[in-house]
Amino acid sequence: MSAAPDAQDSTANDRFTVLIPARMASTRLPGKPLADLAGLPMVVRVAKRAVHSAADRVLVATDDARILQACAAHGVEAILTRADHASGSDRLAEACAQLGLADQHIVVNVQGDEPLIAPELIDAVAALLPARPEAGMGTAAHAIATLADYHNPQVVKVVLDARGLAQYFSRAPIPFARNPAEHGWCSAGAAPGMGTLAGHAPLRHIGIYSYRAGFLRQLTQLAPAPTETIEALEQLRALWHGHRIAVHLTAAAAGPGVDTPEDLERVRRLLL
């Protein structure tokens, strides 16, 4: 079964919890979770988008009391985790333990720097796991629209198999077109991947994940993959150890995330 575009979107058919990892120690934008976006801290704005999904519960998982207090001030549920976690997945695994989530309970990892996340996308990624029991994880992607994004190492690409499962994620331009002229990829501003390469269009990975709580705990106990370290992409750990990742294809590009001061100003303008 291959991944389907938005025409076949469905809401999650199993109960799930949204967890939003948040930490203050961003290297490119210190204090990012509490950055003001139209009168709300960014992590609060993310949570308030997520509550419009079908999730039973939306929580922020943080190691900082300031984030905890900001969430409480705006009616957002949050829990305090240890400060020594190596990744957001480790933080969420601790949160699952604190919450006593059963192994089969679905958890959706929504990044705390995605203030324009679509609730419908959260539902679609949650719905992957009941629909695709062979997959340990779910995520999302959309077709790349420009050559600049295709070649940008900050834009993570994903290649799928015929069943809509991820084969590989990379910062490199994949799939690489040996004869780009045959696919209309030559001119600046072209739209590679829109109906080209017989279903193997260049796809931009969207950083949202679903897992069952038991799988998340298992994943954090696995050794890091060499490819994970080389690419600095944590999801490659699952593929390295033989687990499958189902990918929801959406026709709509995700709203801009916030990694830099320039990103922050861009989102502020969008919220005016």
Curated annotation (Swiss-Prot):
InterPro entries: Cytidylyl_trans, KdsB, Nucleotide-diphossugar_trans
GO biological process terms on file: CMP-keto-3-deoxy-D-manno-octulosonic acid biosynthetic process; lipopolysaccharide biosynthetic process
Keyword Lipid metabolism tagged: no
EC category: transferase
Subcellular location: Cytoplasm
Catalysed reaction, written as an equation: 3-deoxy-alpha-D-manno-oct-2-ulosonate + CTP = CMP-3-deoxy-beta-D-manno-octulosonate + diphosphate
UniProt keywords, alphabetically: Cytoplasm, Lipopolysaccharide biosynthesis, Nucleotidyltransferase, Transferase
GO CC annotation: cytosol
Main location as per UniProt: cytoplasm
EC number(s) from the headed UniProt entry: 2.7.7.38
GO MF, any single term: 3-deoxy-manno-octulosonate cytidylyltransferase activity
Pathway entry: Nucleotide-sugar biosynthesis; CMP-3-deoxy-D-manno-octulosonate biosynthesis; CMP-3-deoxy-D-manno-octulosonate from 3-deoxy-D-manno-octulosonate and CTP: step 1/1; Bacterial outer membrane biogenesis; lipopolysaccharide biosynthesis
UniProt family annotation: Belongs to the KdsB family.
Primary role: Activates KDO (a required 8-carbon sugar) for incorporation into bacterial lipopolysaccharide in Gram-negative bacteria.
HAMAP family, per the entry: KdsB (MF_00057)
Protein name: 3-deoxy-manno-octulosonate cytidylyltransferase
Organism this protein belongs to: Verminephrobacter eiseniae (strain EF01-2)
